[in-house]
Amino acid sequence: RFFHRLGAWQVDRTIGSTAGEAAILSVYGAKLGPAPQDFARAGLILVWGGNVHGNNVHLWPFIEEARRNGARLVVIDPYRTRTAALADEHLAINLGTDAALALGMMHVILREGLEDAEYIARCTTGFAELKAQVLKEENAPEAVALATGIAAETIVRLARASANAGRDGRGPAAIRLNYGIQRSQYCG
């Protein structure tokens, strides 16, 4: 009765996931990411903050299909999950530094002019302000490496791979954001 009075019966999934879903909705305009079958066509798959192998079993066969077709699987997670163990690369990021890593990757992409300028002009607002913030030295890979525990060279390589996915003759990048990112301070 207590939770009913609070309106908790109206929560989309769980109280913990609702905040993240509201944030995603405000930024992307939709709560859902790519359909699981879309991952089969990816050239680079980033699993960020989750154990897909154990917790998204419906997605795993599509990731396996993509890998059979040459896709790389990179897991960004402080924990060595089963998914991380099966990945081509596991980036064991320091707890609570996911946002810093994302900003570091964006810094590289914008500094090197790897962004999709046509898409940005057509589909976004506020990009000039975002770019000014992202290009600050505090978001440079060398600074981000100190916070995240991920080498600056790795941040640069991952940013370039993400930006160039789909341009390299293989499929585009597909990112699976999971709830682990929103469940600690300073995360994405």
Predicted regions and their residues:
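Cofactor-pocket helix-loop regions in the catalytic cores of large enzyme subunits
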Residues: R1-G188
